[in-house]
Every structure is written in C-alpha cells, then in structure tokens.
Amino acid sequence: LLNTDRNTHNMDYRWLDLNREPVWINCRGYIIRGDQQEPIYLIGCINEIGNRQKADNITGLLGETSLEKYFKDSVSTLNKGFLIHVGIDCFKMINENYGWDYGDYVLRETASCILSCISDSQKVYKIASDEFIILDTTSSDMTTASNLYDHICKHINQFIEENNFAAVFTISAGILPLPDLSQTGYAELIKRTDFSLTMAKQHGRNCCYIFQEEEYQNFLRIREITNELHSAVNHGFRGFSIIFQPVMDIQQDKLTGAEVLIRFASKKFGPISPAEFIPLLETSGLIIPTGRWFMREAITACRKIRMQIPDFKVNINVSQVQITKSDIITDLISEMDASGLPPA
C-alpha cells in the first residue's frame, strides 16, 4: 500500500489466535493521505471469517455465539424468563427495492428500537440476517413479553414515520417461556424459538405467537411423517398399500367393481389417516409419483381380477394437484397400455 496509489485495502489471510491456532481473517480499510499524498492512516476493520462472529458488524449487537455461551454458562442458574425471537417481515424485499445499504440502515434502526425498549435486565442478540433474540431472565409472564413486543412495534412505527415512510415494514415475533435448560438444551431451545417465529409469520405477520407445546409436537409429527413419505417414495413406495371397497349391483347381488383406496403406515406412528398424509403428499409434491404408483397398482389388480370377473371395474380418486401439475391422462393411458388392460 505504501508503494502504490491505491486508497483501499481488502485482503483475506491467516493469523494465529491466543491459543496459537490459525484463523482466517478479513482486513479491509481506507487510506487517509496527507498534503503530499503520503499515507498517514489506514482506517478500517478486521473481522474473523470462516467462523461465527461474536458480534454483528452492522448492528454492533452480540451474535448467536455469545447467546449460546451465555446459556451454557447459566444452565444451572436460569429458572425463569422468556425469549422473544423477532424477525423483520419481508426483509428481502427491502434489500431488493432499496438496496443493501438501506437494508443495513433498517437493521441498525430496528436494533436501536429494540434497545430503547428493553430494560437493564434484558439482553438482545442478533442471530440471523434479519432476526434478533431478546432474553429476559427475571420474569416468565407472557403478558410482559407480548407487551414488550407491542412496545417495540410502536417504536418501529415511529421510526418509519420520522423517515417519511421511505420503507414501510413490520416485525413478527415468537415468544417462548424458558424451559428447563438442563432437560431441553440450547439446540432444542433455538428450534422452539424458530418454530414460534414461523408460526407468527404464518398467522399473517405483524403479530406475535406464544409457544404452545401441543402445536409444536404436532409440527414435529408432521415433519416426521413428511420425512417418512419422502423415504417411502425413494424406496419403492415402502409403507404404502391399497385396499378395495366393493361396489355391488344390489338388484343382481353381484360384485361389479371396487373403489381403490390408498393407505400409508408409518414406522413410528402406525397407520396414518388419509386425511392427514394426502395433504402432506400434495404440499410436498410427492402426490405426483405416488399417484402414478397408486394408479399402476390399481390397474394391475384390476387386470388380475378380470381373469375371474371379466367386467370388473375399478374407480380411483385423483388429487387436484395431479390434475394441474402433471399430465394425468397420459399417465393413465401409459399405465393401462403397459398392463394390457383395455378401458371399460
């Protein structure tokens, strides 16, 4: 730098930390020159990279590393309190519409609004690009927590108004009473705050959601069943089966066909109601391959039964997702041609 005309410096390289362990850092800055253009100062910053930082460069708040350390150091003494997981709604749109610099400005002002609302006994951490966690270890009162959220919202609205509504945004929050950390652990704690914030956003954003154990367990159940469905589809539709509901000609007392129904048995939960697993197939997109498998099984079964009952017919149900997202007519014709089953 001393021998060039460059005024900026930005370089990644390795240092040794206090334990003589190598760490990657980024050093960047701007050169201040004197009257004769001689370099006088290098103003900038040095950041550790390739590892989680202790503090956030944009807001100056401590980061998740510090939050995790605090909990691990305090696990035996914390017996009450709450967490508020705050997220800026649609923050990506702020960056896209106004640029990253303005997005950073919104982050700093949001942090400032939070800091102006919390008490000396409360702490705030920056844990993700647009998310913060407020920690209170003095009260487990959920009304106190929700009132704090409302207070922060008012300060943010005031900031937006003072900024001439250049960008209008809201925040959502998930509120979690502190559980027994010796039983729960830090990783599970963060999963629960993530769930609470997600629920607040699913409820329409610009609101807070207080953690409910029953809803969380249902969320875990849905996630596990969805994972099992993925695994089943990837392993030859293991766990799926079909059953037949007879269709009778009452006047002739004769079996004429059947409605074919799909069933799924979970390794962990046992038989799952179609009212539960079919919507999961639809939302995950697995209904397309599963529907083809179901169609194939029904047609194959029909062909075998026709050896005994020549005019036997089967009825199958299809999903709206199959109709709109796949060429279901082509699939049906292809499966019938492959089985040698003529249409009724």
Each language-model region and where it sits:
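Active-site core of bacterial EAL-family cyclic-dinucleotide phosphodiesterase domains
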Residues: 14, 221-280, 317
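Short loop/turn elements at sensory-signaling interfaces that couple input to output
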Residues: 27-43, 255, 266
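Catalytic strand-loop-helix junctions within cyclic-nucleotide turnover domains
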Residues: 34, 135-145, 161-166, 170-189, ...
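C-di-GMP signaling machinery
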Residues: 48-51, 199-241, 251, 281-285, ...
